Amino acid sequence: MDISYIFVICLMALCSGGSSLSQVEGKQKSGRGRGSMWWGIAKVGEPNNITPIMYMDPAIHSTLRRKQRRLVRDNPGVLGALVKGANLAISECQHQFRNRRWNCSTRNFSRGKNLFGKIVDRGCRETSFIYAITSAAVTHSIARACSEGTIESCTCDYSHQSRSPQANHQAGSVAGVRDWEWGGCSDNIGFGFKFSREFVDTGERGRNLREKMNLHNNEAGRAHVQAEMRQECKCHGMSGSCTVKTCWMRLANFRVIGDNLKARFDGATRVQVTNSLRATNALAPVSPNAAGSNSVGSNGLIIPQSGLVYGEEEERMLNDHMPDILLENSHPISKIHHPNMPSPNSLPQAGQRGGRNGRRQGRKHNRYHFQLNPHNPEHKPPGSKDLVYLEPSPSFCEKNLRQGILGTHGRQCNETSLGVDGCGLMCCGRGYRRDEVVVVERCACTFHWCCEVKCKLCRTKKVIYTCL
């Protein structure tokens, strides 16, 4: 009886074919909520008040996975940088979308993966931006914290100072006489990039299209931070002359990264799973020789073949000067040797590890080893800095708490604008109300020695427009 029942079930599954697979994908999309629990650390308190042992606090402990807790424990001081990065991502997201129907609100939502609401359950453009901006903020915050000395396991990036004298001469001047030197304290983008991968991408195994979407957008956020590294210099000489310049690499202001990601949001690429790959429930990895694919180097890092993840300069910086970081299974990965770091020759290589740990390491790096296909076959595949999404965004016009949509009723709009912040688009055609309000502001401020600033209180009338 049992055998016959099993046979009938199997026969029904075979007959249903692709429809069954579509139903499985639908359940995975609409099943348990998406999002990342670690986002909840943004609500645990001020970053400057975070102590290294606070990872054991129940409020923080519940928002982190086991691997994330281990990374926090093994890198003292990193928790404060993570909290700062999470808050940086929220504030930048709200700034970029302050004039949009969806304004990245976190006010009415709980902590953890629901910090941004249930919109993250949908694979839409807004979700892609959330993942990219949070990943970028962690990379930026960790890299800056290393140069500020607040994380015990990392320092400034001294890899540029280890370049050969010939390379410095070529970079310094055409005549071969160097007029500047590497010095100062460069922001440690290598450590920030690698730590962000290990921490942010925890739980994203790349086994289905949604996880691949998350991984791609996380990588895009990190790539934008890395691409905006800039060289800063300081002159040294008598009477203000610039006889010699000392230069270092500095992260750009995070507003620049936010602006770039917002531009990518507007031009995001919709991707899909093809019928030939639907049975695998994910896009198949691209062969190392395929255009736009990656290969895994001997040190376990992803090496792009055609700029899928990094450019040549970024690839050189990450693969040749990877700082020390405590990873899963406590295997540090390093290619640059400092007195307080283990020798690169003594480090186990990813391909040399045997048993379960070796297979796990291989799976971890293979999750970045794919190429997403555009929904429209006439469009080119997304690049390393492009954002990708799976489904169209909702209108965000009407309140729908079930989907995490607050609506635009009561939102202020710009009556003279024809853009997305204009009353026509913001109010979804429902109309708007004109009100005159009296605003009290500080004005006519003067400085009095010493040391006080005195201001007057001025009342001004302003006209505001509010969506019905």
From Swiss-Prot:
Primary location class: secreted
Record note on disruption phenotype: Accumulation in the Golgi, thereby preventing secretion.
N-terminal signal peptide: 1-17
Glycosylated residues (UniProt): N103, N108, N414
The organism's place on the tree of life at top rank: Eukaryota
A Gene Ontology cellular-component term: extracellular region
Bilayer disposition of the protein: Lipid-anchor
Location in the cell: Secreted; Synapse; Membrane; Secreted, Extracellular space, Extracellular matrix
UniProt KW keywords: Developmental protein, Disulfide bond, Extracellular matrix, Glycoprotein, Lipoprotein, Membrane, Morphogen, Secreted, Segmentation polarity protein, Signal, Synapse, Wnt signaling pathway
One GO biological process term: imaginal disc-derived wing margin morphogenesis
Tissue expression from the record: Segmented expression in embryos. In embryonic tracheal cells, expression is in stripes flanking the tracheal placode.
Chain residue ranges for the region called Disordered: 333-362
Residues covered by region (Binds porcupine): 83-106
Entry PTM: Palmitoleoylated by porcupine. The lipid group functions as a sorting signal, targeting the ligand to polarized vesicles that transport wg to unique sites at the cell surface. Depalmitoleoylated by notum, leading to inhibit Wnt signaling pathway. Major form is glycosylated at 2 sites, glycosylation is stimulated by porcupine at the ER.
Disulphide linkage map: C93-C104, C146-C154, C156-C185, C233-C247, C235-C242, C397-C428, C413-C423, C427-C467, C443-C458, C445-C455, C450-C451
Function: Binds as a ligand to a family of frizzled seven-transmembrane receptors and acts through a cascade of genes on the nucleus. Segment polarity protein. May be a growth factor. Acts on neighboring cells to regulate at least one gene, the homeobox segmentation gene engrailed. Wg signal represses arm phosphorylation. Wg signaling operates by inactivating the sgg repression of engrailed autoactivation. Wg and Wnt2 have a role in the developing trachea and together are responsible for all dorsal trunk formation. Wg also acts in the developing epidermis.
Record-stated family: Belongs to the Wnt family.
UniProt name for this protein: Protein wingless
Organism, scientific name: Drosophila melanogaster (Fruit fly)
Name of the coding gene: wg
